[in-house]
């Protein structure tokens, strides 16, 4: 579904280089130390950064040079980027038409995703009138209403309290499973990764240093566990 072949980004003339394959419907966590290149990897996939070399394939098509607006990808950031002067209904509608002129089918899609996110009663409110969790639900709805096959999450729930964060992770995981979306999620928490992603990759020094089962990483038995400060539970 998603394949990166030696995708290279030059950071202060030092190369970050990624080779990765992710299957359709797979949920993968991206972990690693601060500054390792996790967000860079997502931005290369989304098209916000242009690689110096390499190839990026999505569903077998070459999207290495495709602009972000035309890539079959949606991305959600920690900063939800909602427009403060637009209400919830309009912010979601932007995912369907930047001009907010929606036909009947598009309006039904907008309303359906609002119901699924549990925000249908908030449609007339402005972002400033919402809680942090509600704003992230709106931002997630705007991503999902675009119906792209790849969803990228760059720590969008890290500012939420633990209970709400777990609720949002479960919601995302369920929706991705239901729609067979391919999910890549950057996180600093291996515990969060274990809730949503059976597979993890660890990025270090601009490379994929390890990839495998999240449970193995969490147990401390993986070679990359030490990079994340995880100690083996075996005495």
Curated annotation (Swiss-Prot):
Q: Name one GO cellular component term.
A: plasma membrane
Indicate whether Methyltransferase appears among the record's keywords: no
Question: What membrane topology is given?
Answer: Peripheral membrane protein
From the Swiss-Prot or TrEMBL record, state where the protein is found: Cell inner membrane
Q: What is its EC number?
A: 7.6.2.15
A Pfam family hit: ABC_tran
- Catalytic activity, per the record? thiamine(out) + ATP + H2O = thiamine(in) + ADP + phosphate + H(+)
Q: Which residues form the ABC transporter domain?
A: 2-230
Q: What class of enzyme is it?
A: translocase
Q: Which PROSITE patterns match?
A: ABC_TRANSPORTER_1, ABC_TRANSPORTER_2, THIQ
SUPFAM superfamilies reported in the protein's UniProt record = P-loop containing nucleoside triphosphate hydrolases (SSF52540)
Q: What is its main location?
A: membrane
Q: GO: which molecular function terms?
A: ABC-type thiamine transporter activity; ATP binding; ATP hydrolysis activity
Entry-linked InterPro entries: AAA+_ATPase (IPR003593), ABC_SmlMolc_Importer (IPR050093), ABC_transporter-like_ATP-bd (IPR003439), ABC_transporter-like_CS (IPR017871), P-loop_NTPase (IPR027417), Thiamine_ABC_ThiQ (IPR005968)
Cite the binding residues for ATP.
32-39
- Alphabetical keyword list: ATP-binding, Cell inner membrane, Cell membrane, Membrane, Nucleotide-binding, Translocase, Transport
Q: How does it assemble?
A: The complex is composed of two ATP-binding proteins (ThiQ), two transmembrane proteins (ThiP) and a solute-binding protein (ThiB).
The family classification in the record reads: Belongs to the ABC transporter superfamily. Thiamine importer (TC 3.A.1.19.1) family.
Describe its function. Answer: Part of the ABC transporter complex ThiBPQ involved in thiamine import. Responsible for energy coupling to the transport system.
- What's the name of the protein? Thiamine import ATP-binding protein ThiQ
